[in-house]
C-alpha cells in the first residue's frame, strides 16, 4: 500500500473525500514524466502523484463526464458490501448518465 497525493478539487479527491488515497500498488510500468506538460496542454489532468518517487498514479480528463485512470489497484481492496471510492463513483456516474 502506498500513499498517493491527490490534487485538490480533482474528481478523485472528491470521490475519496481526501487529499490522499491509500491503495495497493504493483508497478511494472511508469508514466514518463517528460510527456507530462504536452498531455496537460491538451486537457489531461495528473491528479494523483506518489510524491516519494514522483510517479503519476491517477489521471483524469475533466472535459468528460467520468474518466479516471489509476496505476494503483482498487480492485484488490474493494468488497461487494464496501466498494472502493473509484468503483462507487464510477457506478454512480453510470446511473446518473442513464437518467
From Swiss-Prot:
PROSITE patterns cross-referenced by the UniProt entry: GATASE_TYPE_1
Binding site for L-glutamine: 28
GO CC terms of this entry: cytosol
EC top class named in words: ligase
InterPro entries documented for this protein: Class_I_gatase-like, CTP_synthase, GATASE
Pathway: Pyrimidine metabolism; CTP biosynthesis via de novo pathway; CTP from UDP: step 2/2
Zinc found in the keyword field: no
GO biological process per UniProt: 'de novo' CTP biosynthetic process; pyrimidine nucleobase biosynthetic process
Keyword entries, A-Z: ATP-binding, Glutamine amidotransferase, Ligase, Magnesium, Metal-binding, Nucleotide-binding, Pyrimidine biosynthesis
GO molecular function: ATP binding; CTP synthase activity; glutaminase activity; identical protein binding; metal ion binding
Catalytic activity from the UniProt record: UTP + L-glutamine + ATP + H2O = CTP + L-glutamate + ADP + phosphate + 2 H(+); L-glutamine + H2O = L-glutamate + NH4(+); UTP + NH4(+) + ATP = CTP + ADP + phosphate + 2 H(+)
SUPFAM superfamilies hit by this protein: Class I glutamine amidotransferase-like (SSF52317)
EC number: 6.3.4.2
Residues the record marks as active site: 73, 75
Residue span, Glutamine amidotransferase type-1 domain: 1-99
Entry's family note: Belongs to the CTP synthase family.
Further remark: CTPSs have evolved a hybrid strategy for distinguishing between UTP and CTP. The overlapping regions of the product feedback inhibitory and substrate sites recognize a common feature in both compounds, the triphosphate moiety. To differentiate isosteric substrate and product pyrimidine rings, an additional pocket far from the expected kinase/ligase catalytic site, specifically recognizes the cytosine and ribose portions of the product inhibitor.
Subunit structure: Homotetramer.
PANTHER family on file: CTP SYNTHASE (PTHR11550), CTP SYNTHASE-RELATED (PTHR11550:SF0)
Annotated function: Catalyzes the ATP-dependent amination of UTP to CTP with either L-glutamine or ammonia as the source of nitrogen. Regulates intracellular CTP levels through interactions with the four ribonucleotide triphosphates.
Protein name, UniProt field: CTP synthase
Protein's gene: pyrG
